[in-house]
Amino acid sequence: SHNPAKYNGYKAYGPDGCQLGLEAADYVLSIMNKVDIFDDVKTTDFENAVKEGKIEYIGDDIINEYLDCVMACRVAPNTDVGALKVIYTPLHGSGNKPVRKILSKIGVTNVTVVPEQEKPNGNFPTAPYPNPEIRQAFECALKLAKDIKPDLLLATDPDCDRVGIAIPDKDEYKLFSGNDVGALLLDFVLSRRKANGTLPKDPIAVKTIVSTELCRKIADNYGCKLIDVLTGFKFIGEQITELEKKGEENRYVFGFEESYGYLGGTYVRDKDAVIASMLICEMVAFYKAEGKSLIDVLDGLYKKYGYYLCSQKSFTCEGESGMNKIKGIMTELRTNPPTEINGHKVVKRDDYDTSVSYDTVNGVENKITLPKSNVLCYYMEDGSSLIVRPSGTEPKIKMYLGSVGKTMESSEKELSLLADVGTKLLGF
């Protein structure tokens, strides 16, 4: 995925193309646990497996059908994208062919691929941490940009489900966060589909609980219902599947998570950097034709809805003592929940492990209908928020911070203070 070369693993998907949900994953794991990995594993050679139909090659017909599905999700098909100049890096991964193919199909032909990162290489020699969320992954592309001076830099992670972007900002290049791009894409998709007359009745967008609340304001403006789900794109995929069961999948317009995952269609049930790259190119070209950059557009959203800013901090707690420390932090927060954070009264706290949302102002408890998860959320009277959860894959406890202000300066100050207060609250 987007981890260093030393990491190993796999993702398990169901017949609907969505990662296995909690119940299905537990069932599969129970079957796996019954298998003796030394005696019960059946083996065969590759060619025999192909002959027996146990392994199937994905043909061009499937690939072309996939590309057609992505193309059908364009929201500004009349936008002239031909003049767009793009630098792209697949970060030694699988994105090179599909991303370049889809960009070519919509007319983006001036694409320069970072040469030293073009071919797949699981050792990731030029990007030890091939994650488009961090600036280091863009270093080769940024060097190339000094000569080419593109309108847009795109970087997809090795399995091509996340995409990061950078655009010119005076003499430098500004990298956008996943929340920035998620808000921009949601507004772009909703505004263009409304203008095109293709916005469905009672549209639905989906985001994870740790993603920016700016999207709620944007969705409300277009009469779009915004659904919150637990962290992990499989929960966004599950929402599409539930809509499909009711014959209402056309209501889904967009889904995203702050960790650079986006999906603008229902043809798959996971984040997809191919469609995201297409929509981003459309968006940059559309606003360029209006004389705007994404910096201008994002600032316009802030001025209209409020300066919603987000950040996160992780604290590493290794070994058994670290696990106990994380457990102790979560227990203490549940036993003695804060009533005030950063000088602002906590008006609501959500505990996804007990499935209880508590309105501290009115003293009312409401049931959380999402699956149980070890997550605690605190919402303050000024609109700021603090969310705490242990990492599911690393020996870390994570803290997600959100602030909102009438100016960038006031929101940035609030976010910085909130980070300090949150760090002390967790005991670090």
Regions from the language model: what does each represent?
Residues 146, 150-152, 156, 172, ...:
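Phosphate-binding and adjacent anionic-ligand microenvironments
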Residues 1-36, 131-155, 160, 183-189, ...:
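Phosphate/diphosphate-binding loops
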Residues 24, 95, 178-185, 211-215, ...:
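Catalytic-loop motifs flanking and including active-site residues across diverse enzymes
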Residues 8-145:
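Gly/Ser/Thr-enriched, mixed-charge loops and adjacent short helices
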Residues 6-13, 99, 161-180, 215-218:
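Short Gly/Thr/Asp-enriched flexible loops that form oxyanion-binding sites at enzyme active sites
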Residues 3, 90-96, 160-162, 210-213, ...:
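Gly/Ser/Thr-rich loops at beta-strand to alpha-helix junctions
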Residues 20-21, 167-193:
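Cysteine protease catalytic core and zymogen-processing segment of caspase-like enzymes
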